[in-house]
Amino acid sequence: MAYRKLGRDSAHRKAMLREMTTQLIMNERIVTTETRAKEIRKTTEKMITLGKRGDLSARRKAAAFVRNEIADIHEEKDAVVVKSALQKLFSDIAPRYKDRNGGYTRMYKLATPRKGDAAPMVIIELV
């Protein structure tokens, strides 16, 4: 499988992709550079496909990749409900795309490049 090196060694690149994929699942929209977004798109699509499968093996594979972070905290009837990024993937995001075969993300190019190095910036979001 082809991939971009993104100017990092393999461990740093994998950690960055895991972190940014988790952030996209939690926030459903992030701003990043165009090349990073193209790589994040691949991993996010795979995680959502695993979420749609929903069996134990898919949950374990997704749990191995998605970081264990808190996605949402809210109160329900005198109880505080804490939802992790993995729970959000399987309970909120995957059912939303049950009738859709791929193409779960959308990228918008921003008009202004990044200030320091003029890197092209995009907004990547879940459809």
From Swiss-Prot:
GO molecular function terms noted in the UniProt entry: structural constituent of ribosome
Alphabetic keyword roster: Ribonucleoprotein, Ribosomal protein
Keyword Ribonucleoprotein included in the entry's annotation: yes
Record flagged with keyword Ribonucleoprotein: yes
GO cellular component, one term: cytosolic large ribosomal subunit
A Pfam short name: Ribosomal_L17
GO term, biological process aspect, one: translation
Entry superkingdom: Bacteria
Alphabetical list of InterPro entries matching this protein: Ribosomal_bL17, Ribosomal_bL17_CS, Ribosomal_bL17_sf
Gene3D superfamilies: Ribosomal protein L17
Subunit details: Part of the 50S ribosomal subunit. Contacts protein L32.
HAMAP family the UniProt entry points to: Ribosomal_bL17
NCBIfam families assigned to the protein according to its UniProt record, in alphabetical order: L17
PANTHER family found in the cross-reference section: LARGE RIBOSOMAL SUBUNIT PROTEIN BL17M (PTHR14413:SF16), RIBOSOMAL PROTEIN L17 (PTHR14413)
Family as reported in the entry's similarity comment: Belongs to the bacterial ribosomal protein bL17 family.
UniProt protein name: Large ribosomal subunit protein bL17
Natural source organism: Lactobacillus gasseri (strain ATCC 33323 / DSM 20243 / BCRC 14619 / CIP 102991 / JCM 1131 / KCTC 3163 / NCIMB 11718 / NCTC 13722 / AM63)
